[in-house]
């Protein structure tokens, strides 16, 4: 079988309508059909978002001393709280925190940090130590254990490329750029003409999952509409699709999407303002949509980046750093600022020292929102306390 035929059977279409992850092993026995009404939506900020100019230590004079070219004036930051405040583009974030729906987890990172975009994203997506390599994503491992046989829409990635976080041994997730055109011809019929060669059983099962996933997504979309008008941006479009799938009772446990463009080595003030505006407007629309549908208690939104930026500016921008804030919205979180304000006088070779390991946040999400024992997927960090 050539590559073209294999891709047509597994549902990877050149038009970007659907991509399925690569799977490495045969299908094994599974446990426990996914149940429950909670789901988590992950928004990954690719490029390394500058946390210090996102959630700003505006009362710390070192912030202004170390960033003479890019520090944000205390007169323009918003939502001031305990010496910290939001970038002025994040008006929706400030309002969500005022409503008690947004928590900020400060100084999130991991030991022995890696400043490579690719490797640090891989560490976050697999929940590995920085010196270890894992083939499957942390959410993929969770779905493998929680799905009986397979459930092709247990995880949804709104993107044009697969996300390692959702990669598992079973076809329990689907990557789709535009769910509205996620309509395939009868893949089961094509899969049925395969030989009885056991090596092709995997192909047959994945091909059948394409059709099953397509049917489930179309049914969910048919039962829901967009209740509000979203901005005309890529992230907002993705979140609007996710909102419709949630309101249509697709019963996916995890959704994933991303926003590129945060690698601000130069011209940071303008670039980050534009990116944070897109993030704010898209997420606040999503929040408003789900709030109107009385679903925010069922949906937890997690916003993060693979690393922050160095504390001292390089002129008009910043270079790759380490620790940065994470944001958690909805899901009955406690709406708190968790952790100490960034310590700008005690740095690790010019970088912030991490205070909370990102895997402790993952552990809390799995334990509190998905009722899952996080140690079963290899997370040894204790769950973060005080988030939910």
PLM features: residue spans?
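Anion-binding catalytic surfaces of enzymes that hydrolyze or transfer phosphate/sulfate esters
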Residues: 194-285, 289
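Patatin-like phospholipase A catalytic core
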Residues: 147-233
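Intrinsic-disorder/low-complexity recognition with aromatic hotspots
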Residues: 22-86, 92, 97-99
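N-terminal export signals
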Residues: 5-26
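Extracytoplasmic mature domains of secreted/periplasmic and thylakoid-lumen proteins
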Residues: 31, 84-186
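Feature marks hydrolase-like catalytic cores characterized by long aromatic- and Gly/Pro-rich stretches
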Residues: 71-86, 264-388
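Beta-strand elements within well-structured catalytic alpha/beta cores of enzymes
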Residues: 38-49, 93, 103, 253-259, ...
């Amino acid at each position: 079988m050539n590559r073209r035929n294999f891709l047509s059977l597994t549902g990877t279409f050149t038009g970007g309508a659907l991509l399925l992850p690569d799977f490495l092993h045969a299908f094994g026995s599974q446990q426990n059909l996914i149940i429950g009404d909670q789901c988590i939506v992950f928004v990954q900020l690719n490029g390394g978002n500058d946390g210090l100019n996102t959630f700003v230590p505006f009362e710390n004079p070192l912030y202004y001393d170390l960033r003479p070219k890019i520090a944000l004036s205390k007169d323009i930051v918003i939502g001031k709280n305990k010496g910290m405040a939001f970038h002025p583009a994040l008006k929706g974030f400030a309002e969500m925190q005022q409503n008690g729906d947004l928590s900020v987890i400060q100084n999130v990172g991991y030991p022995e940090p890696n400043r490579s975009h690719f490797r640090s994203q891989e560490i976050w997506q697999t929940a590995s130590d920085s010196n270890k390599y894992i083939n499957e994503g942390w959410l993929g491992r969770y779905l493998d254990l929680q799905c009986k046989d397979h459930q092709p829409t247990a995880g949804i990635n709104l993107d044009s490329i697969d996300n390692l976080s959702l990669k598992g041994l079973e076809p329990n997730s689907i990557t789709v750029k535009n769910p509205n055109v996620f309509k395939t011809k009868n893949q089961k019929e094509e899969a049925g003409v395969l030989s009885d060669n056991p090596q092709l059983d995997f192909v047959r099962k994945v091909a059948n999952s394409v059709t099953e996933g397509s049917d489930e997504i179309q049914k969910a979309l048919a039962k829901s509409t967009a209740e509000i008008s979203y901005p005309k941006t890529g992230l907002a479009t993705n979140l609007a699709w996710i909102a419709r799938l949630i309101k249509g009772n697709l019963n996916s446990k995890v959704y994933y999407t991303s926003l590129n463009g945060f690698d601000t080595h130069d011209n940071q003030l303008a670039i980050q303002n534009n990116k944070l505006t897109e993030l704010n407007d898209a997420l606040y629309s999503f929040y408003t949509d789900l709030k109107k549908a009385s679903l925010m208690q069922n949906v937890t939104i997690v916003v993060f980046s693979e690393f922050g930026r160095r504390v001292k500016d390089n002129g008009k921008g910043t270079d790759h750093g380490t620790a940065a804030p994470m944001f958690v919205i909805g899901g009955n979180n406690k709406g708190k600022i968790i952790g100490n304000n960034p310590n700008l006088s005690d740095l690790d070779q010019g970088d912030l020292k991490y205070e909370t390991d990102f895997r402790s946040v993952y552990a809390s999400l799995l334990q509190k929102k998905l009722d899952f024992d996080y140690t079963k997927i290899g997370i040894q960090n204790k769950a973060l306390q005080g988030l939910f």
